[in-house]
A protein has these predicted regions:
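Short, charged/polar surface micro-motifs in flexible loops or helix N-caps
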Residues: 16-20, 44-45, 75-77
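Basic amphipathic alpha-helical segments that dock to polyanions
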Residues: 35-47
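Beta-hairpin "wing" of winged helix-turn-helix
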Residues: 45-62, 70
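Exposed loop/turn and edge beta-strand positions of beta-sandwich/beta-sheet ligand-binding modules
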Residues: 65
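Amphipathic alpha-helical dimerization/coiled-coil segments
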Residues: 1, 73-101
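N-terminal helix-turn-helix DNA-binding core of bacterial DNA-binding proteins
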Residues: 1-36
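Short beta-strand element of the conserved SAM-dependent methyltransferase core
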Residues: 27, 69-71
Length: 101
């Protein structure tokens, strides 16, 4: 599984309780053309389950039905590992001086 930075952001958003595409886009700052392919890939790889909300809920708010995503137990493990890995990378100090000196 490719754990790119955008994929890690989506996984982190799911860990934090963001469950539908627009909510994930708001949480991550990523565009729909990035978020939805990642969600499809995570679904295909067994990291998330998805379900459509009941049409009545959407109708009440006069909007299209939302598709909700939830991490599976496997997905939760992958997400935690990915987030921890990127956090560790942020703690690596930047090199001092110029290379070769």
């Amino acid at each position: 599984m490719r754990l790119t930075y955008p994929t890690t952001l989506v996984l982190q958003a799911l860990l934090q309780g963001h469950h539908h595409g627009f909510d994930i886009m708001d949480a991550t700052g990523l565009p729909s053309g990035t978020v939805y392919p990642i969600l499809r890939r995570l679904d295909a790889e067994g990291c998330v389950r998805s379900r459509w909300e009941k049409p009545g809920e959407a109708r009440k708010e006069q909007r299209p039905p939302r598709r909700y995503y939830e991490l599976t137990s496997h997905g939760r493990s992958v997400a935690t590992e990915a987030v921890d890995r990127y956090r560790a990378l942020q703690e690596v100090p930047a090199p001092v001086g110029r290379p070769g000196r």
